[in-house]
Curated annotation (Swiss-Prot):
Highly expressed in the aorta, lower expression detected in the heart, brain, kidney, lung, muscle, ovary and testis. Residues 1-52, 310-339 are annotated as: Disordered. Belongs to the HEY family. A motif (YQPW motif) lies at residues 329-332. Induction: By activation of the Notch signaling pathway. This is Hairy/enhancer-of-split related with YRPW motif protein 2. Residues 48-103 form the bHLH domain. PROSITE patterns: BHLH (PS50888), ORANGE (PS51054).
Length: 339
C-alpha cells in the first residue's frame, strides 16, 4: 500500500514540476513577456507615425488649396467666374493652362502689366464720359451740334484725352528705350517756351488770344505734327502773355532732344488713331507744332542761345484775319457753371 502512495506523490510532484517547468520554459513566453513590457512604446510610436503622416498630408493639401486660390485670383477668366459659382480644381487648372497659352501666343504681353491695364481702363472710361457729355448736351440741354459752347467743350475734353494717351505712350517708349532714366525726355517739354504751343509756331499777335479751336479753323498744313504737352493745366499752358516777348527759358536740352522728335511723331500717330476711333472730329482741337517751329527749337537748344526769344508782333495776313474772327479766351468755369 505504501508503494502506490509513493508513486502518486512522485507523479504529483512530477506534474507540479512539469507544470512549473512548462510555465517557465515555454518557448513563446519570453517573446510574449517582452511584447507585454514594450507594448506601450510600440503603440506610441505607431500613433506618432500616424499623426506625423496626417500633419504632412494636411500641409500638402493646404499648399495645394492655397495655390489654387492664387490661380483663381490671378487668372482673369477664373476671377470673373469667382462670384457666380464655386469653381472646381480641374476648371481652375484648365483656365490657367489656357491663360498661359494665350500669354505664349501674344509674346508674354498679357495681364501682368498692371499699369498698362489700369491706363487702358482709364482711357476707356474717359472716352465714355466724353461720349456721355456730348449726349447730354445734345439730348438734355438741347444744344445743336454746331453750338459754340458744345463744340469748345467737346474739343477741350477730347484734347485732354488725347494728351493723356499720348503722354502714356511716350512714357512707355522712353521707359523701354532708356531704362536707367525713363523720364529724362520730360525736361524737353518743361523748358519749351509757350510760343511753341501756338498753332502758327513762333509768330503771334497781341490782339489774337489763344483759345481752343475747332477743326474748321485750323489749316490742314499744321496737322502733320502734334506736340503732346505734359503740363498739369492745359489751359494755362495754352495761354500767351499779353506782351510780345517770351522769357529766356530755353536751357540746353542735351540728350532730351534725341527723344523729342520721336515723342512728337508718336503723339501724332496716337491722335490720328483716336480721331479714327471716335465719331467726332478732333483734328483742330490739338495744339500743333509745325515742322519749322520744331527745327527752330532744336537749333536754338543745340546752340544754347543766351538771349531771350522774341516773338514778332506782326503776323501773316491769313493769321491776322483768323485772329480777328476768334473769340477771346473765356474760363471754362463760367460757361459750365451755367448748367
Amino acid at each position: 500500500m505504501k508503494r502506490p502512495c509513493e508513486e502518486t506523490t512522485s507523479e504529483s510532484d512530477l506534474d507540479e514540476t512539469i507544470d512549473v517547468g512548462s510555465e517557465n520554459n515555454y518557448p513563446g513566453h519570453a517573446t510574449s513577456s517582452v511584447m507585454r513590457s514594450n507594448s506601450p512604446t510600440t503603440t506610441s510610436q505607431i500613433m506618432a507615425r500616424k499623426k506625423r503622416r496626417g500633419i504632412i498630408e494636411k500641409r500638402r493639401r493646404d499648399r495645394i488649396n492655397n495655390s489654387l486660390s492664387e490661380l483663381r485670383r490671378l487668372v482673369p477668366t477664373a476671377f470673373e467666374k469667382q462670384g457666380s459659382a464655386k469653381l472646381e480644381k480641374a476648371e481652375i487648372l484648365q483656365m490657367t493652362v489656357d491663360h498661359l497659352k494665350m500669354l505664349q501666343a501674344t509674346g508674354g504681353k498679357g495681364y501682368f502689366d498692371a499699369h498698362a491695364l489700369a491706363t487702358d481702363f482709364m482711357s476707356i472710361g474717359f472716352r465714355e464720359c466724353l461720349t456721355e457729355v456730348a449726349r447730354y448736351l445734345s439730348s438734355v440741354e438741347g444744344l445743336d451740334p454746331s453750338d459754340p459752347l458744345r463744340v469748345r467743350l467737346v474739343s477741350h475734353l477730347s484734347t485732354c484725352a488725347s494728351q493723356r494717351e499720348a503722354a502714356v505712350m511716350t512714357s512707355s517708349m522712353a521707359h523701354h528705350h532708356h531704362p536707367l532714366h525713363p523720364h529724362h525726355w520730360a525736361a524737353a517739354f518743361h523748358h519749351l517756351p509757350t510760343a511753341l504751343l501756338q498753332p502758327n509756331g513762333l509768330h503771334t499777335s497781341e490782339s489774337t488770344p489763344c483759345r481752343l479751336s475747332t477743326s474748321s479753323e485750323v489749316p490742314s498744313a499744321h496737322g502733320s505734327a502734334l506736340l503732346t504737352a505734359t503740363f498739369a493745366h492745359a489751359d494755362s499752358a495754352l495761354r500767351m502773355p499779353s506782351g510780345g516777348t517770351v522769357a529766356p527759358c530755353v536751357p540746353p536740352l542735351s540728350t532730351s532732344l534725341l527723344s523729342l522728335s520721336a515723342t512728337v511723331h508718336a503723339a501724332a500717330a496716337a491722335a490720328t488713331a483716336a480721331a479714327h476711333s471716335f465719331p467726332l472730329s478732333f483734328a483742330g482741337a490739338f495744339p500743333m507744332l509745325p515742322s519749322n517751329a520744331a527745327a527752330a527749337a532744336a537749333v536754338a537748344a543745340a546752340t544754347a542761345i543766351s538771349p531771350p526769344l522774341s516773338v514778332s508782333a506782326a503776323s501773316s495776313p491769313q493769321q491776322t484775319s483768323t485772329g480777328t474772327n476768334n473769340k477771346p479766351y473765356q474760363p471754362w468755369g463760367t460757361e459750365v457753371g451755367a448748367f
